[in-house]
Amino acid sequence: MSVESGLKTFRDADGLWENYPVQQVATHEGWEADPVLVTNFYNMLRRKCVGVKPNEGHRLVAKLEEQYEVTVVTQNVDNLHEVAGSSHVIHLHGELMKVCSSRDVENRRYWKTLTPDDCEVVPGTKAGDGSLLRPYIVFFGEAVPNISLAAHEVSEADILIIIGTSLNVYPAAGLVHYAKPNAAIYLIDPNPVVGGMLSNVHHLHKGASAGMKELSEQLMK
């Protein structure tokens, strides 16, 4: 969804992320091999993110809260949903503007939220437990800590809106199967979906902003 705001996707088809091999910057092995490189890579991503604004799709999702109880479940690591005004966001793959203990990633005592004016981490900076501060990002091969929470939210939803995902990245792609049988499910994506899609999904073949504009006009009547 953030592509329309100018941010590149988490992983391009060629296995590169901002011209870096994913194995170097988004795996535990990459972190262990060169924490300075990984720290500076995410510093660079934060600098880019700070200069980016939410697009119309983000704003329209946030606007749904005027009439609905909305939970956003996102695979994106940026904070554009929050900046746009969404108040309940579950990040599956971590949060770019947070850092954590490299020894105990989910220990909130050692989390630190960075700000636009102070978004970089000096390589070698320690967390409260003495380990290196690392990006609060779910590296490839690591468990997705919020997946159960996300599945619960999907199972409770009367309306499920899926935006800009190929439904090929698991475990997130499996969330749609937790939807209630009578839930209204909408997919906003200009590309065809290959396999695995439920028969009761309304597919809007549009980009995030254009699709959300059309759908919000229906839902906000």
What are the language-model segments listed below?
Residues 1-221:
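Conserved catalytic core of sirtuin-type NAD+-dependent deacylases
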